[in-house]
Structure formats: structure tokens, C-alpha cells
Amino acid sequence: MFNAILSICEKNNLFPDPLYIKVDFEKAVINAAKNVLGEHLIINGCFYHLCQSTHRKLSELGLKKKYQEDYDFNEFCGMLDGLASLPLNRLQEGVDYLKSVIPLGAEDLFQYFEETYVSGTIRRINKQNTLHLTVRRFPAMFPPETWNVHQTTLNNNHRTNNVCESWNNRFCHLVGGKHPSIWTLITKIKNEMCAKLAL
């Protein structure tokens, strides 16, 4: 996808070199973006999708009812997502605080968040089939620099990619679904362009 976009840009004498992009939390997209656009690229995860990930895990762990009925549990989940608003240099302080007030039943959710978004996992590995086991820390799949919105908020930038999601929603409505024929797509785009020009 990124290569296709760059090719179209180059055909139109445009040579983008973005400094950052905002994406959902999909490792394949992040890897592709860095591979095509360069390692210098700063990846910002969408805050909405971070919260959605927490709530998906909540459901997966069978904690939805507890979330709806237990005020303290609900508040803890909000604070978990709220870690994204802390300055990066105070994040560990926030994680440590949440660890100290974790309500009963939230342990697995907290562990998921910490391993996926904060500190990663610790695994035992067996090097070269020996009897010697080594313990190694693997980094978080999405490190805090990816999902932290503190500076983004201070800079008055978007914390989510809702603008894109909204456009995509509108576009799907415009073309009558998610998989229109190429002819329907061309006709609808032409109609949209004519409507814009008429304004």
C-alpha cells in the first residue's frame, strides 16, 4: 500500500517524506511503513484504538459484566487507558501506582497491558539445545512512545485517526458499500468531484 501511494505521488512529481504517521495498532502496518518510508518514521498509535484494545481484552477475559457493574473496576480500566496521557518520564510512576491499587479480577488485564504496551515480556530461552536456560526480556509490542498522547495533546494535534475513519465511513456510504465494482467507484468519484466543483 505504501509503495503504491509513493508511486502515484512520484508520477505526479510529489516526493513525500513524512516524519510521522498515525496508525491503528497493527504490527504489520507499522513494519511496512518503516520498511517503505524509513526507520526515521515516528509511529503514533491512535488513542481510540488503544482504548478499544483494552476493552476487547476485557471482553476476552470475561470481565465485561464486572466492568459494567463494579465502579472501582471500571475506574481502574479508565486509569489504565489514562496512562497514555502521562508524560513519558512519569509513565513508570503511573504503572507502579496502578500496580499498587489493582482491584481483584483485573490482574490479567493489567498484565496484558503492561506486557503489550509498557515493558514487554520475560521469557526463558534454551540456547542451542543445551541444559542452560537464559531469561530474556522481549520489548513491548507497542512501546509507550507509540501510544503516549501527552505531547500530542499539548501540541494540539489529533490523538486519534477519527478524521480518516470518518472519511472512510462516508466514502463507503457514498459508493454503496465496502466492495463496489470499479465502475461504480469511478462513477461515484466523478459525481463527488462534480458536486465539489459546483460549490
Regions from the PLM with identified roles:
Residues 1-6:
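Inter-domain linker/hinge segments that demarcate the starts of reverse transcriptase
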Residues 7-198:
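Extended amphipathic alpha-helical interaction segments
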